[in-house]
Amino acid sequence: MINNINRIKKTYNTFLNVNKLRYSTSIISSNILENDNNNIDDFEQVLKSTKVRMPTSALLLPKKPKVCIGMSGGVDSTITAKLLKLQGFDVTGVFIKSWDEVEDTGRCQGERDWKDALEASNFLDIPMYKADFVKDYWNRVFVDFLKDYKNGLTPNPDVWCNREIKFDLFFDFAKENFGVDYIATGHYSNLYYGEENVGDNNNNNLQLHRAIDKNKDQTFFLCMTKGERLKQAIFPIGGFTKENIVSFAKTIPNFSKITSKKSSRGICFIGKRPLPDFLSQYMTLKPGDFFDISTNSFIKGKKHKGSVCYTMGQKANIDSLSERYFIVRSDIERNIVYVCPESQFDQFSLYYEFNTHSFNWINEIPTEVKSEQGFKGRGICRHRGDVVNLTIKDTGKTSPIDGSVIYSVNLDQPLRSVASGQILCLFDRNTDRCFGGGVINSSPLYNPTQF
């Protein structure tokens, strides 16, 4: 048991020692836990000795910083709060409400999550509050979500929720109401603050890096958040694996409920509902035809529920066909959804290039971006997606959407079904550093010539 604990400490300390090299990173084995024989005292020892990275200006504070943590009632934010509490931080918990589930569905998972968060905060002996951002979420995230779908795009509202709510309004709320120095979340990601000038409000030394647990890494959801806002945050569990966090929680009897909760997947406010059922509450959906590009004909007797509901790459779910069919393209104007058999799908779905706009550079823009050769990095286009080598270059053109710079992106290996409206998360070629992200604008690989 002692050896097991020492291995956890050694792994995390190795991760921290890497930070002494200005911006280096290292991939560390996540095969740390092999049994569940450890007790709460053992794991508390690990949490107490795990140093939390903070800006160097925090060292000038007369005592440990005052931190407000967003608590969801899940295991990640709960263990994050416990870690901070054990290390003497002045911790306040806030449950962020951004969606009115009762009005939307008549059910309320959010209230159950609130009760779980409240129970956890009571056990941890930290004050707990609820912040209502429902109207703000509607105006700053959901309205654009609906508009994008109406225009045939594939938005990711969770990315924009982080940018607009969790790392913008939430920090302002916490600062105004509780006078906090920083906010904390249970994100699996890492921030490197570098050598900062005290009193300097720029973020020239801030860097966002992937978590050591690549399967749970959430940097993708943070890549569109502005650097000056990330500078106000700390991510205490980015150096742990999900397995570590769950094992910590299992040693605490009061936390047994949260360890059995499933991680949320998909768009948070849609839940398990089919997308057409959800969108039909907010826009008029018109049934239409499926067009089979392998036979160059419409599929008789089969109707879709509205072309705005279908995204390139998803299963078409058309029954009574000889093989599985996939969405190739949705024509919003004609209300036609183009599909093809799985056996032919690659020729209409593999992308080697696309453009991005509205790019969010967390820190400085690499000088190579404006060179003829471009900047050679890596990228992903969806959470847990394939990480591929790429070259990104400033085209010298601006987007008609918002006047932002258009960047061309060329991939060394193709990515499947890169839809407009999705997000490109840009990484360094050789490290886990995230430079930021941009909104994808891709051209369909299939252009119909007849109907």
Curated annotation (Swiss-Prot):
One of the record's GO molecular function terms: tRNA binding
Catalyzed reactions: 5-taurinomethyluridine(34) in tRNA + S-sulfanyl-L-cysteinyl-[protein] + AH2 + ATP = 5-taurinomethyl-2-thiouridine(34) in tRNA + L-cysteinyl-[protein] + A + AMP + diphosphate + H(+)
UniProt entry keywords in alphabetical sequence: ATP-binding, Disulfide bond, Mitochondrion, Nucleotide-binding, RNA-binding, Transferase, tRNA processing, tRNA-binding
Region (Interaction with tRNA): 216-218, 386-387
Keyword flag NAD: no
Record-marked site positions (Interaction with tRNA): H187, Q422
Location of this chain's protein in the cell: Mitochondrion
Residues the entry annotates as binding ATP: G70, M71, S72, G73, G74, V75, D76, S77, G186
Disulphide bond pairs: C161-C268
Matching InterPro entries: MnmA-like, MnmA-like_C, MnmA-like_central, MnmA-like_central_sf, Rossmann-like_a/b/a_fold
UniProt cross-references to Pfam families, sorted A to Z: tRNA_Me_trans, tRNA_Me_trans_C, tRNA_Me_trans_M
Active site positions, chain numbering: C161 (nucleophile), C268 (cysteine persulfide intermediate)
Chief location: mitochondrion
Biological processes per GO annotation: tRNA wobble position uridine thiolation
EC number(s) on file: 2.8.1.14
Gene3D superfamilies named among the record's database cross-references: Adenine nucleotide alpha hydrolases-like domains, HUPs, Translation factors
GO cellular component: a single term: mitochondrion
Region of interest (Interaction with target base in tRNA), residue spans: 156-158
Family assignment from sequence similarity: Belongs to the MnmA/TRMU family.
Function: Catalyzes the 2-thiolation of uridine at the wobble position (U34) of mitochondrial tRNA(Lys), tRNA(Glu) and tRNA(Gln). Required for the formation of 5-taurinomethyl-2-thiouridine (tm5s2U) of mitochondrial tRNA(Lys), tRNA(Glu), and tRNA(Gln) at the wobble position. ATP is required to activate the C2 atom of the wobble base.
Additional detail: During the reaction, ATP is used to activate the C2 atom of U34 by adenylation. After this, the persulfide sulfur on the catalytic cysteine is transferred to the C2 atom of the wobble base (U34) of mitochondrial tRNA(Lys), tRNA(Glu) and tRNA(Gln). The reaction probably involves hydrogen sulfide that is generated from the persulfide intermediate and that acts as a nucleophile towards the activated C2 atom on U34. Subsequently, a transient disulfide bond is formed between the two active site cysteine residues.
Protein name stated in the entry: Mitochondrial tRNA-specific 2-thiouridylase 1
Protein encoded by which gene: trmu
